Amino acid sequence: MNLWIKRALLALGALLLLAALAAMYFIATFDATHYKSVAIDWMKTERQRTLAIDGPVDLSVLPRLAVKVSKLRLSERGRADEFASIDEAALSLQWLPLLRNQLVVDSVSARGVRALITRDAQGQRNIDDLLGAKSDAAPGKTSGPAMRFEVGSVRIEDSSLALRDEQAQITGTVMMDSFTSGRLASGQETPLQFRTTVTLERPQVLRLTFDGKTALTFDAANGSATLRDATVKVGGDSEAVKSLHATLAGNLAWDGSTLTAGPIDVNLSDAKTAALTLGPSTLIAQRLVYSPS
């Protein structure tokens, strides 16, 4: 073997050994209480919010970076009212892809996530401070190539998002009973399954449940996405329609500016209005097109 190759391999081995030793030292000396305090102080100083971490923080760095937290609560800005809480969340990602400007997340899981999004009549939202200031950079210009990312799997259970929008006069809650996905990466098709409940108080009272599955493909570069072989069971009640039970099936595509659907099959099992009782029926739409612009 060439002498320089041997030296390069020895140097690489030494670097890997040093990295492993450094990781072992970091784990051995990791003080969760200290990092909790740092996060709590930063949130209080920079965002004027109170962060509470009542559960343990687990960390591992080899063979991948993995973090697990539980019992988190975050207050509204400048107030003690709860903005969000998490019963349990975990994330793990790979180290080496970061060197190639790639973010490869092995898995993301969360249970018991609760959040409240509000917007007042003037358009101010309670998340504006968390989103940060708008960039002054010219549109279309970036400091470098965008980081590529992929996620091996996502699992969310027993989570909800409450919405109070005074500007749009909407009050409601989206309850995510379960959501699972396969590998999420630009240009790759992945299966999705979900069970969710949407409840509205304004502009009208309704409660709808959705139980569905589909195959998602998205393109991060142009913002397009397709849903293939989507099947969604819908049930619920509203002020106008009671005892709704239906199944929707079909394909959807968004190219960044236009939504195209079709063919779409709507199979109604039953539904009731003030004047009618509807029995089993079917509606087929070969193609639907909607352009917001």
What are these regions (language model features)?
Residues 54-65:
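Short edge beta-strands and adjacent turn/loop segments
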